């Protein structure tokens, strides 16, 4: 997959094409909103996305600014915060005073509304729930993803199943039908629908973790 500048260039190329379409269609653009799967440092507009190699203090704003005409503002925020804004605007959190949105994908994050405001927190890190330690002992060898993410994110579910298939030499189920290194969360859900025992075990644990995290987060409101 793409890393570092390759991802930034791809985003800039897509933005340039969209701006060209808007110009040719005589669509006026006031601003551009971008959400990223990580943290945006508001003082510098640089970003950190742990699941994108090379995006540590990455100058995404400068990359996008280079293809954007003067006068058009660029706003970058975390995906979890943007999800929450969307729910406030047109979704389940419309007119809500306090709410939490848990986003499960490659990683895990949470958008949080308190007193009608979407929170950003110290260093814009609020809602980075993937590092929540929900089960002892905390697995330091997975600190790149975090305890909660290891058990219940897309990447984590795939990693847990790969570990389980490697460890169980007698296992002959559906997940053995492809190279272990290529097993993804998609494969796990597919195997779950066919009652695969490893998929069932891993996904039941993920559901348990989602429930625990939801209960803990709600208690903060």
Model-inferred region functions:
Residues 42, 113, 220:
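Short, acidic, Ser/Thr-enriched surface-loop or helix-capping motifs
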Residues 1-12, 16, 20-32, 38-98:
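Glycine-rich phosphate-binding loop and adjoining helix at the ATP-binding site
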Residues 14-21, 201-221:
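Phosphate/ATP-binding catalytic cores across multiple sugar-kinase/actin-like superfamilies
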Residues 37-40, 105-107:
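Short glycine-rich anion-binding loops that position phosphate/pyrophosphate groups of nucleotides
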Residues 34, 157, 210:
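Residue-level signal for inorganic ion chemistry
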Residues 20-27, 167-173, 216-221:
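Surface-exposed helix-capping loop/turn segments at secondary-structure junctions
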Residues 1-4, 68, 73-75, 89-205, ...:
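Glycine/GP-enriched mid-protein hinge/lid loop-to-helix segment characteristic of carbohydrate kinases
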């Amino acid at each position: 997959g793409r890393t570092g500048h390759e991802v930034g260039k791809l985003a800039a190329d897509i933005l340039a094409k969209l701006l060209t379409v808007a110009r040719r269609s005589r669509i006026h653009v006031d601003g551009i909103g971008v959400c990223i799967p990580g943290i945006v440092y508001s003082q510098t507009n640089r970003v950190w996305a742990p699941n994108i190699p090379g995006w540590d203090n990455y100058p995404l704003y400068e990359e996008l600014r280079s293809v954007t005409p003067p006068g058009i503002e660029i706003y970058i925020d975390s995906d979890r915060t943007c999800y929450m804004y969307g729910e406030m605007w047109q979704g389940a959190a419309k007119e809500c005073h306090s709410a939490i949105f848990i986003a499960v994908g490659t990683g895990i994050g949470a958008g949080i509304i308190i007193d009608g405001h979407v929170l950003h927190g110290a260093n814009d890190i609020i809602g980075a729930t993937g590092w929540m330690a929900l089960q002892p002992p905390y697995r330091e060898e997975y600190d790149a993803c975090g305890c909660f993410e290891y058990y219940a994110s897309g990447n984590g579910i795939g990693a847990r199943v790969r570990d389980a298939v490697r460890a169980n030499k007698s296992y002959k189920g559906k997940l053995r039908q492809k190279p272990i290194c290529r097993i993804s969360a998609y494969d796990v859900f597919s195997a779950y629908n066919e009652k695969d025992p490893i998929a069932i075990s891993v996904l039941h644990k993920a559901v348990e973790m989602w429930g625990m995290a939801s209960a803990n987060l709600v208690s903060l409101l």
